[in-house]
Regions:
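NUDIX/MutT-family hydrolases
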Residues: 73-75, 84-116
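The catalytic Nudix box helix
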Residues: 18-51, 74
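Generic C-terminal helix-cap and adjacent flexible tail
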Residues: 117-124
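Active-site-adjacent beta-strand/loop module that shapes the phosphate/pyrophosphate-binding cleft
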Residues: 54-82
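A short beta-loop-beta micro-motif enriched in histidine and acidic residues
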Residues: 11, 65-67, 88-89
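N-terminal strand-loop-strand
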Residues: 1-17, 45, 49, 76-78
């Protein structure tokens, strides 16, 4: 299963996706990930290895870059199953991999989730 959040803000407002956010000045990537997951889901996690690195560029109606994110996806382990959505998420759910289509998760996110599944299978 995988943890999904329904985005409260743009980009992708209302869409189900993996938890994440912005790195604050002076913050390490691992610390930013742990903080964002805690803020969005109420979960404390053990940050594991990098699964994938993806560029996300979104253009406005005039063809100008509106958003450009470099997304680094990690495999994490949660210390508990109890979740509660925070201020950046409308909802948070544990979702079986077989049910991802019900949540209209993007193809890129599904690909990352599949990579994470394989990586987790090979971890002690």
């Amino acid at each position: 299963r995988v943890l999904l959040v329904r985005r409260r803000h743009e980009p992708l407002k209302g869409a189900w996706s993996l938890p994440g956010g912005v790195v604050e000045v002076g913050e390490t990537l691992d610390a930013a990930l742990a903080r964002e997951v805690l803020e969005e889901t109420g979960l404390s996690v053990e940050v594991g290895p990098v699964v994938d690195v993806v560029d996300r560029v979104q253009f406005d109606a005039d063809g100008r870059v509106e958003y450009h994110y470099v997304i680094i996806d990690y495999l994490c382990r949660a210390w508990t199953d109890r979740i509660a959505h925070g201020s950046d998420a409308d909802a948070v759910r544990w979702v079986a991999l077989a049910d991802l289509a019900v949540y209209c998760v993007s193809g890129k996110a599904v690909a990352v989730i599949q990579k994470a599944k394989e990586l987790a299978r090979n971890r002690p």
